[in-house]
């Protein structure tokens, strides 16, 4: 019996929450993509305009085909938005989030001109690390899995064979000694800590072993042994100690994607020594004695650490030896964890495909310098992201999703499905060209008209200087305006967009930050200054994407300020006009009256964790707005963690839960912030 609002399809493990039936072009798009996959097409393109419900279409295709899926987005902000939406559509299935877990990342580098070596430095976001581990666990355990990720998925994460071979399967009644369980946990990179019980740790009290799985957000496992036999397995809350569920069986997954069996490490040590001998011989023959001394000293230290501890700092640079791969072979990535029949969706593909192709070259240039000057062995070059052709060789059946497909999608797609008609009946905005020499004064007048109707305005300029000057000019004339620029971090950017929707201010000025995936139904006017200056920011695709920001409003309008009409402008205006004509015709044929979008304003990462709540018990907490840098946030996180544990020790569980919720809110704020 399916719950109300849920839809199931024959042979599919997914339960799709569908509060409304597909409408507009959605039914035809869903049918076309499903048929294309069934026909064995490798590449398809969903050409979906802004606001046409592309995510809903993707969700329907996944649910109907019943296969695991990987959805790639060009950045963490859009990945979080997609993740939240997919969680809404599939609340009963495994929707996972796989992005870079670095809050801060400074790669190892050498600058020969200054003889400057820069050590690797990074800060790992534990919450995202837990979500990455949860993603691979779901792929190995269940078919109803959807992973939402970024280009982080083409970076090496450890061999899936080694990872799967290291799991610890526990069943009630199994014969296993306490010593064997502890040895297996240590080999899986869990740490024993009887005092501070956190994710990736275990503690021992007599015959009872508590394990906090690395991929679990909130529940731990209690294993009770009697006479070298598993007596009970229980899931419990680590904070309160309350038992939630008794289990007949539990699988403990490794504490890291990079776990390696001991025999593999010993084998790798021998091959690293062999490569070191070859490299020393090369440097000596070339008279590079400094480089020879440098590589010998660094590598021998790493070998000693591997021998004694099983890992070393920068172990990823020896990944080729640990995986047993041949020189030049690509590293194992998340894509190797996907089943052969999985689906792939590349959202905003005109941007994402370019990123997939560009990651390898930048990484290679930096590492070649390290190898040349004796900081790393040549095998370090194989610790790298996939090249585009390697990614293509590993791709599953794929759908490119974009309002403006690029040349790559056009050349590869066997089937192009258009989704131009919106379910709401909204049509693409009218596009108007006005003279550039009076653009600022004209824009001010237009802004006042829109503000009087309580609507919002987006303005895009060509340079940072012009954005700043325009923002100052508008502010001097009484306009509530903000400026969005590249120095603003991800979380603050999300808050600015949220404030625009809430009406804290009316006009947002930016350069290249107003294009893909910004969902702002309140925006009725998009103004593009200097639209006739040909280049990346005024290309056909950029113009169509920017014009599309006004397509979610009933009174959507776009003004291009230009003294001449360029080829890019002409093509963008023709395409917008074609779509608008098709939409108006569809509305007329079906008697549809366009209606505006009323979308609740919510935190972008809603659904990643429970919504934050306020509690009187935390009156001393620092307001989120006051935490402007990483150090302040780190201090507040430590303070809240200590407060939570103090309350728990004193059996003040309500206050402990309040501190935990405040901690969750703060970690949510940090969640989107990262490098890749």
Swiss-Prot record:
GO terms under cellular component = cytoplasm; excinuclease repair complex
Sites binding ATP sit at: 48-55
User: Residue numbers of motif Beta-hairpin?
Assistant: 101-124
Q: Where in the cell is it found?
A: Cytoplasm
Which keywords, in A-to-Z order, does the entry hold?
Answer: ATP-binding, Cytoplasm, DNA damage, DNA excision, DNA repair, Excision nuclease, Helicase, Hydrolase, Nucleotide-binding, SOS response
Give the superkingdom in one word. Answer: Bacteria
Q: Which Pfam families match?
A: Helicase_C (PF00271), ResIII (PF04851), UVR (PF02151), UvrB (PF12344), UvrB_inter (PF17757)
Ranges of residues in domain UVR: 634-669
Q: Domain Helicase C-terminal, which positions?
A: 439-605
Q: Where is the Helicase ATP-binding domain?
A: 35-192
Give one GO biological process term: nucleotide-excision repair
Any one Gene Ontology MF annotation carried by this entry is: ATP hydrolysis activity
Q: How does it assemble?
A: Forms a heterotetramer with UvrA during the search for lesions. Interacts with UvrC in an incision complex.
Relate the protein's function as given in its record: The UvrABC repair system catalyzes the recognition and processing of DNA lesions. A damage recognition complex composed of 2 UvrA and 2 UvrB subunits scans DNA for abnormalities. Upon binding of the UvrA(2)B(2) complex to a putative damaged site, the DNA wraps around one UvrB monomer. DNA wrap is dependent on ATP binding by UvrB and probably causes local melting of the DNA helix, facilitating insertion of UvrB beta-hairpin between the DNA strands. Then UvrB probes one DNA strand for the presence of a lesion.
Could you tell me which NCBIfam families the record lists for this protein?
PRK05298.1 (NF003673), uvrb (TIGR00631)
Family that this chain belongs to: Belongs to the UvrB family.
Domain-level remarks: The beta-hairpin motif is involved in DNA binding.
Name by which UniProt lists this protein: UvrABC system protein B
The gene from which this protein is expressed is uvrB
């Amino acid at each position: 019996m399916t719950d109300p609002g849920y839809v199931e399809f024959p042979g599919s493990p997914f339960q799709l929450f569908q509060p409304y039936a597909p409408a507009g072009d959605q039914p035809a798009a869903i049918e076309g993509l499903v048929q294309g996959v069934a026909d064995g097409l490798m590449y398809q393109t969903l050409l979906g305009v802004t606001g046409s419900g592309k995510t809903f279409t993707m969700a329907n295709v996944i649910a109907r085909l019943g296969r695991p899926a990987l959805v790639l987005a060009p950045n963490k902000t859009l990945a979080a938005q997609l993740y939240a939406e997919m969680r809404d559509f599939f609340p009963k299935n495994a929707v996972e989030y796989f992005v870079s877990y670095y809050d801060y990342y400074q790669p190892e580098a050498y600058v020969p001109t200054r003889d400057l070596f820069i050590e690797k430095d990074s800060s790992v976001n534990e919450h995202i690390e837990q979500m990455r581990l949860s993603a691979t666990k779901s792929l190995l355990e269940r078919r109803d899995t959807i992973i939402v990720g970024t280009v982080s998925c083409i970076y090496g994460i450890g061999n899936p064979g080694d990872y799967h071979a290291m799991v610890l399967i526990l069943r009630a009644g199994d014969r296993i000694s306490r010593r064997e369980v502890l040895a297996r946990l240590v080999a899986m990179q869990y740490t024993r800590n009887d005092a501070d019980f956190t994710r990736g740790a275990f503690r021992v009290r007599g015959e009872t072993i508590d394990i906090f799985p690395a991929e679990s957000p909130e529940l731990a496992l209690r294993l009770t042994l009697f006479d070298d036999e598993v007596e009970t397995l229980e899931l419990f809350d680590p904070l309160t100690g309350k038992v939630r569920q008794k289990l007949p069986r539990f699988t403990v997954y490794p504490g890291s994607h990079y776990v390696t069996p001991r025999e593999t490490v010993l084998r790798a040590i021998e091959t690293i020594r062999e490569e070191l001998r070859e490299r020393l011989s090369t440097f000596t023959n070339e008279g590079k004695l400094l480089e020879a001394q440098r590589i010998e000293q660094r590598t021998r230290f790493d070998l000693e650490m591997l021998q004694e501890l099983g890992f070393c700092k920068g172990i990823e640079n020896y990944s080729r030896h640990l995986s047993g791969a041949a020189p030049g072979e690509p590293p194992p990535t998340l894509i190797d964890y996907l089943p052969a029949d999985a689906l792939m969706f590349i959202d905003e593909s005109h941007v994402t495909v370019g990123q997939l192709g560009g990651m390898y070259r930048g990484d290679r240039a930096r590492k070649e310098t390290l190898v040349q000057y004796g900081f790393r062995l040549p095998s370090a070059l194989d610790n790298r992201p996939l090249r585009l052709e390697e990614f293509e060789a590993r791709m599953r059946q794929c759908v490119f999703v974009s309002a403006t497909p690029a040349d790559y999608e056009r050349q590869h797609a066997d089937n192009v499905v258009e989704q131009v008609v919106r379910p709401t009946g909204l049509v693409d905005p009218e596009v108007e060209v006005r003279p550039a020499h009076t653009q600022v004064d004209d824009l001010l007048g237009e802004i006042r008209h829109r503000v009087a109707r309580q609507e919002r305005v987006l303005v895009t300029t060509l340079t940072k200087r012009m954005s700043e000057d325009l923002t100052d000019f508008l502010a001097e004339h009484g306009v509530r305006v903000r400026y969005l620029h590249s120095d603003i971090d991800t979380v603050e950017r999300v808050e600015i967009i949220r404030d625009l929707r809430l009406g804290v201010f009316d006009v947002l000025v930016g350069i290249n930050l107003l294009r893909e995936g910004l969902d702002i139904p309140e925006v009725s006017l998009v103004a593009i200054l200097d639209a006739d200056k040909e280049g990346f920011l005024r290309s056909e695709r950029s113009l169509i994407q920017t014009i599309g920001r006004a397509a979610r409003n009933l009174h959507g309008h776009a003004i291009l300020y230009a003294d001449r009409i360029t080829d890019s402008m002409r093509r963008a205006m023709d395409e917008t006009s074609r779509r608008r004509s098709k939409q108006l015709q569809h509305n007329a044929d079906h008697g549809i009256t366009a209606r505006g979008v009323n979308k609740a304003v919510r935190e972008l990462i809603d659904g990643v964790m429970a919504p934050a709540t306020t509690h009187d018990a935390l009156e001393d907490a620092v307001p989120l707005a006051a935490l402007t840098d990483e150090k302040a946030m780190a201090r507040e996180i430590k303070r809240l963690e200590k407060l939570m544990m103090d309350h728990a020790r004193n059996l003040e569980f309500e206050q402990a839960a309040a501190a935990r919720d405040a901690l969750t809110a703060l970690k949510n704020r940090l969640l989107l912030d990262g490098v890749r």
